[in-house]
């Protein structure tokens, strides 16, 4: 019962936000939902506020894009377009759908493996490099969000409780807390969500398949014999590449292996915090007594180890800053905490254009 009251209060907060933004339909929807969850709630004032609003569809931008798609249907018959009616229908259905399970064509009891397979299949069909239909970028982003949400246990449970994409995204943004300055966690439901990063993570270098096919068509005829040689040798090379990791694993199994002396990030094995003396960079060790015995304070061994910590952390900041700057090209509002820390710690000689 208390859970229903909490959900009802949350619905009222969403309704209040909708009223402020002038979205009458959304406000009434969540007012009614709150009333069903907790009949004792008084919603007369909110209903009265809704009566003073003109109904504004919060999906107007999507509707305009769909109308543009409809207008382009006639152009498909001229043969000038680089997409088919099937491409348009696929993009249109994904954009209109408000259920992550339905977008991927899955049931609610599906496994993580089924989610991954569905994403691999659908993302290839809707990727903007392959599907040139209007709205393919938005559809590709929505497919990536569906995969990211459902493949994570916590976000999937939260979505199952809500069941609607729009409300789920709204709750994610509303519940977001101010981030710590050097937080490295990826939040896939804010403005810095990058569908290409998800695609590269799942497919790896297979991302280049679209560009490779284009390059093949633009080569000069005198290089055709080279292309045939590559095509013939391709499968055998691919087989070797696939088998190579297994040989490496077998080799590593018989090699002597020693645990690292430290880790920049806390985990089950490294939980004891330490800090470098001058730069105050945090790192973690397995055992405080064993570490201090092996690396006494003010010893050359301790100085060398802390030098490695600083070097590794500096490299981590550079890599993280590079990713932040790439994302910032898409959205200027994206924060760049790692770039700021690089400058604050004096790890760079020049100002980073943020």
Swiss-Prot record:
Keywords: Chaperone, Membrane, Transmembrane, Transmembrane helix. One of its GO terms (cellular component) is membrane. It holds the Pfam family DUF1977. Residues 99-163 form the J domain. Gene3D superfamilies: DnaJ domain. Its main location: membrane. It is a single-pass membrane protein. It is found in: Membrane. The chain crosses the membrane at residues 237-257. The keyword Transmembrane helix applies. SMART domains: DnaJ. Belongs to the DnaJ family. C/III subfamily. Plays a continuous role in plant development probably in the structural organization of compartments. This is Chaperone protein dnaJ 49. It comes from Arabidopsis thaliana. The gene is ATJ49.
């Amino acid at each position: 019962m208390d859970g229903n009251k909490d959900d009802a209060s949350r619905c009222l907060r969403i309704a209040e936000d909708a009223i402020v933004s002038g979205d009458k339909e959304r406000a009434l929807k969540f007012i009614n939902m709150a009333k069903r969850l907790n009949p004792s709630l008084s919603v007369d004032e909110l209903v009265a506020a809704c009566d003073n609003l003109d109904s504004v569809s919060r999906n107007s931008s999507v509707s305009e894009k769909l109308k543009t798609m409809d207008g382009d249907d006639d152009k498909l018959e001229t043969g000038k377009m680089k997409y088919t009616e099937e491409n348009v229908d696929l993009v249109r259905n994904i954009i209109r759908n408000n259920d992550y399970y339905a977008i991927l064509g899955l049931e609610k009891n599906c496994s993580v493996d089924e989610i991954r397979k569905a994403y691999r299949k659908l993302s290839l069909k809707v990727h903007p490099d392959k599907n040139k239909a209007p709205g393919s970028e938005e559809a590709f982003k929505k497919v990536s969000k569906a995969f990211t949400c459902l493949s994570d246990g916590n976000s999937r449970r939260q979505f199952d409780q809500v069941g609607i994409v729009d409300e789920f995204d709204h709750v994610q943004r509303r519940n977001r807390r101010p981030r710590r300055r050097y937080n490295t966690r990826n939040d896939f439901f804010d403005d810095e969500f990058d569908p290409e990063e998800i695609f590269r993570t799942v497919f790896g270098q297979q991302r280049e398949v679209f560009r490779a096919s284009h390059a093949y068509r633009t080569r000069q005829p005198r290089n055709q014999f080279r292309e045939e040689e590559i095509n013939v040798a391709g499968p055998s090379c691919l087989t070797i590449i696939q088998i190579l990791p297994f040989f490496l694993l077998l080799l590593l199994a018989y090699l002597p292996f020693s645990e690292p002396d430290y880790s920049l990030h806390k985990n089950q094995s490294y939980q004891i915090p330490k800090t470098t003396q001058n730069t105050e960079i945090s790192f973690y060790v397995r055992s405080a007594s064993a570490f201090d015995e092996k690396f006494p304070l003010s010893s050359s061994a301790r100085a060398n180890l802390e030098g490695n910590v600083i070097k590794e952390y500096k490299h981590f900041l550079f890599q993280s800053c590079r990713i932040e700057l790439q994302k910032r090209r898409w959205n200027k509002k994206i924060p760049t905490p790692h770039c700021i820390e690089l400058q604050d710690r004096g790890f760079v000689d020049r100002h980073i254009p943020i």
